[in-house]
Each structure stands twice: as C-alpha cells, then as structure tokens.
Amino acid sequence: MKIAKGLVGLLILYKNVCQVLCKSGSSVKSGSPWSIKNDGKSIIHDTLNSSYSDIENLNSRVSPLLFDLTEKSDYMRFYRLNLFNKECRYNLDDNVACGSSACNVLVTDEQDVPEVWSSKSLGKLEGFMPELSRQIVETDRSVMEHVDKISQSCLLERLDDEAHQYCYVDNELDSGCVYVSLLENPERFTGYSGPHSTRIWEMIYNQCLPDSSAPTIDFPALFMQGPLAPPPKPQEQLLKERMDAWTLEQRVFYRVLSGMHSSISTHLCHGYLNQRNGVWGPNLQCFQEKVLNYPERLENLYFAYALMQRAIDKLYGHLDSLTFCHDSVLQDSEVRQKIAGLVSLIHNSPKMFDETMLFAGDPSISTALKEDFREHFKTVSALMDCVGCERCRLWGKIQTNGFGTALKILFEVSNIEDEVTNFDSRSFSLRLRRSEIVALINTFDRLSRSINFVDDFKQIYSEQHKPASFKRRVLRRIKQLLFSVTPVALHPFLQKTSSILVDLYFDFKAEWDNVMLGFRYVFASYLRFPRLFKFVLFSQESPFLNWTSHHLQRYIPKNWFPEVASV
C-alpha cells in the first residue's frame, strides 16, 4: 500500500515538473489583446470581406516597394509646404508651441536661400518653377542609384485646378513655404501632448458628426490623456452606439480619421525615446495603452490601409498622364518604373474596398453629401496648421494631404476599367500636384510601416510573455528566498543590487558575444589559410603565379619560346 502511494506521489510530481519545464506553445493566448488579429478569418468591417491576414500578406509584398520609393527616390524624399507661416484658422485659447528639441524640423536656412526663392522672384513664375529648387540641387546629393545630381524638376510643383480637392494644399509659390527632407525628419515620439493636442483631436473627430445633430459624445473624455489615451468605457460604448446609427459615409469618414490616428500613434510608440538611456526604440506599453487595448482602433488602421490600397489601384491606367521629372529622362523613368511596379502589384491583388457603395443614392442628395464630406475633410486638413509641434504638424499635413488625395482619386476619378468599352483611357486624364503624389505614396508608406510595427510589437509581447526558462525560474526562486530571510529594511538595497547585477550580466554577455564572434572569424580565417595558400601559390588560377609569369615574359625574347603547332 505504501509503495502504491509512493508511486502515485511520484507520478503527480512528474506531471507537475513536466507542466513547468515542458510548457510550450504560443505565448499569444486567446485572451490576449492580439486574439482578434490572431484569427485569420476576422473580417474588417466596411471592406470587401478582407481579413487581417489578407492585408498583412499583401503588405509583405508592398512594403519593400514602398521603402524603395520613399528612401531611394529624390522625388519622394522632399516635400514643400508652409510649415511655419500659416495661421491657425480656429480660435484655440490654449495655443502653445512644443518646447522639446524632438519637435523641431530640419529645413534649409533662410539666409542661405538664393534670391530666386524670394517672394518677388516667386511672384513672377508661372506653371513649372525652373529655379525654385536650385538650392537643394546644389547642396544635396541624390539618393538614387546611378544618379549623382538631383534633377530640379523632381522637386517642382505643377499648378492644378482647386476644384474637387479634399484638403487644403499649400501653394508652393508662397514665399513662406520651405523644403523638408522626410528622411531627416522621421515620424517618431516628440513628447507633444496635453490639453492643446487633445483639443485639436476633439475638433477633428467632431467633423464626423452631422451639423444637424448635437455632439452627444464627449470627445475630450475619449482623449483625455493625449493621443489615443484609454477612454472611459461608457464613452466608448456611446461612440459605438452612435456609429451604428451613422450612414456608411459617416462611418468611412470616422474610420479614416481613426486609422490615421492609430497609424500616427503606432509610429510614435515604435520610435519612442527611452529617457533612461537616450535610445530610440519600440515601447510596448505605449502601444498597448494607445492602440492595442482597443480593437476598433487596430481595425481602423487596417481599414485605412484597405482604402488607401484601392486608391493606389485606381492609378492603374492613369500613370501616362502624370509627369515626375520632366527634364531628366533617367530620373523620370526610374520614378515612373517604381510607381508602376507598385501600382501593378496592387492592381493584380484582390480588391479590398468598394468606393461605389458611397454616395450611391439619389444624384442630388449624393452630390450634396459628397460636398459635405469634402468640406469636413478640408476642415480636418486645416486643423493641422494649429498643431503646436513642428514635426507633428509636418507629418499631420502630409498624411491629411495623402488621405485627401486618396479620397479625391476614389470619388472624383473615373475607373478606367469600367469605361474602357465606351471611351479611350486618355479621356480620363488624372491631374495631381506633385505634393499630392508625394503625400499619397508617403502616407501609404506610413500605413504599411504601421502594419509592420504591429507585428514587431506582437513579437515583443510574445517574447515578454513566453514561459520563463529553467535557469530564470531558479534565479527567481533564489531571489525570493533571499528576500524572505533578510530584513525589510535591506530590501531596497537588494533590489538595487539585483538591478545592477542584471545590467552587468547583459553587458558582459553582449561583450562576450562580440569577443566570441571575433574569435570565430579569426579562427575560421586560419582554417581557410591552407586552401588560400595553395590557391595563391600552386593553382593554375594563382594570381601570384600569373603575375610572375606575365612579368617574366616581358624580359624573355619571344623567339626563345618554342612554337606550338596548330591542330
């Protein structure tokens, strides 16, 4: 009997040990914040039954093309806008400016700008502006392969009709405009927050509400602690109930704004400044508090991607009507080829958003509704001039311009494939400003990177929540035992000592890994030395023997060598 009890006890102990030491599987469980995205069948509302996995699979192919366009193209690299001299159209009593150095934007110094950029000179120019970008051309090298000098026409603006615009586009002839390199001013955490930014986001989201209805939603409560801060549940429930009563057009309008907001917050949390060590990097807690803990925000990010994908798709067949660098065949062809590759890839992918479902009712009503939609989004773009942070204002203006351009393409441009049987495609010429094209591609790139950043945060979450190793559990037990047998007064000292030892361990491990990497490299070179020695001195392809033979032949008479009879 005692033997049987002992065996049962051993079996129970063995089971417990296996559960502790052999625990495996995904650390992202069904109850985690990622559960809604883990299900590949989760459909994103107001799309053509597109799922999270559909968008991620497409983005895995699109992302490298967007990176190549935005990082290695002069055309997409520079953006000209009125960043400092445009007054806010709205009365904000708490109008403030960000005092952090992270808010600053690097631009060309005004005193270094040539005379042709002065207001007098700019006022004399029409159409293309041949001298406007000379300063950048002369002072900055091209980032494109096989190109040494930036073509001025890659930086020029072409004047266009103001009709059918969904956002306010800065006039590049304005002497207050400046060129900004987007590579030198990445979108990342600046520290800009507080009542002022909350007030601006409140005014932006209030554009979702029809003019005839009272704003029953307390948007300041939704965003009390800065961009996308955790809202109270009653307010969030009220917003959901209100959205259920909205029309499709109102829901799309809100989802675009929320998706843009989620993308911005994702970038800020991924490029977050660690105040302890001064290193920029992902901050999972920031992302959880601003986006991940609220599934509708993550869903709206993916919805905005689907909408932007459809806008890029509609460029198919219109590229011939667009000019990029008119005085440089090489740069124009490179930019055109890259954009054509992106558009072609998206065009051959499943359609994710159907713009024809919007404004599809009675023509008189739908026209008025579209005009109201357009004016509300133009108000959103105008609110970007009220942002107190320069870098936030820069990327806010770019992305509202990008989404405004996408909406313009979706709702104002004919679909060539639907009309090709009745009209020649050239009759549907698409006219876009240079700033609109640059904003459109860079905004799509922002969304694409946000999707990638979501996966990065998921990997970090999985790493933090994976089962602890046996060594870590043993060390944790030792630490608990040590704390239990020492006086409470010594606990702060022990905690600080423990943190120092952990830092020392990781620093030592990093240095040791570097030493071992160097050792393996040197040791491998020694192992390859005999083969290298044989190749250099004794092989038929030996560069040493060939060099020696070549030089010896120069001093030996040619007739000394016997002639080889031809076969």
From Swiss-Prot:
Q: Which GO terms describe its cellular component?
A: endoplasmic reticulum; endoplasmic reticulum membrane
SUPFAM superfamilies assigned to the protein according to its UniProt record, in alphabetical order:
ERO1-like
- Which top EC class is named for this enzyme in its record? oxidoreductase
- Specify which residues bind FAD according to the UniProt entry for this protein: 188, 190, 201, 258, 261, 290
Where does it reside? Endoplasmic reticulum membrane
Entry EC no(s): 1.8.4.-
* Pfam family, any one: ERO1
Main site of residence?
A: endoplasmic reticulum
Kindly list every residue the record annotates as glycosylated: 49, 546
Q: How does it sit in the membrane?
A: Peripheral membrane protein
Q: Name one GO molecular function term.
A: protein-disulfide reductase activity
Q: Does the keyword rRNA-binding apply?
A: no
Q: What does UniProt give as the signal peptide span? A: 1-22
Cofactor(s) for this protein? FAD
PTM annotation, UniProt: N-glycosylated.
Active site, renumbered? 389 (nucleophile), 392
Q: Which cysteines are joined by disulfide bonds?
A: 88-386, 98-103, 154-325, 389-392
Q: Which InterPro entries match?
A: Ero1, ERO1-like_sf
Give GO terms for biological process: protein folding in endoplasmic reticulum
Its function, per the record, reads: Essential oxidoreductase that oxidizes proteins in the endoplasmic reticulum to produce disulfide bonds. Acts by oxidizing directly pdi1 isomerase through a direct disulfide exchange. Does not act as a direct oxidant of folding substrate, but relies on pdi1 to transfer oxidizing equivalent. Does not oxidize all pdi related proteins, suggesting that it can discriminate between pdi1 and related proteins. Its reoxidation probably involves electron transfer to molecular oxygen via FAD. Acts independently of glutathione.
- Family assignment from sequence similarity: Belongs to the EROs family.
Describe its assembly.
May function both as a monomer and a homodimer.
Q: What is this protein called?
A: ERO1-like protein 2
Q: Which organism is it from?
A: Schizosaccharomyces pombe (strain 972 / ATCC 24843) (Fission yeast)
Protein's gene: ero12
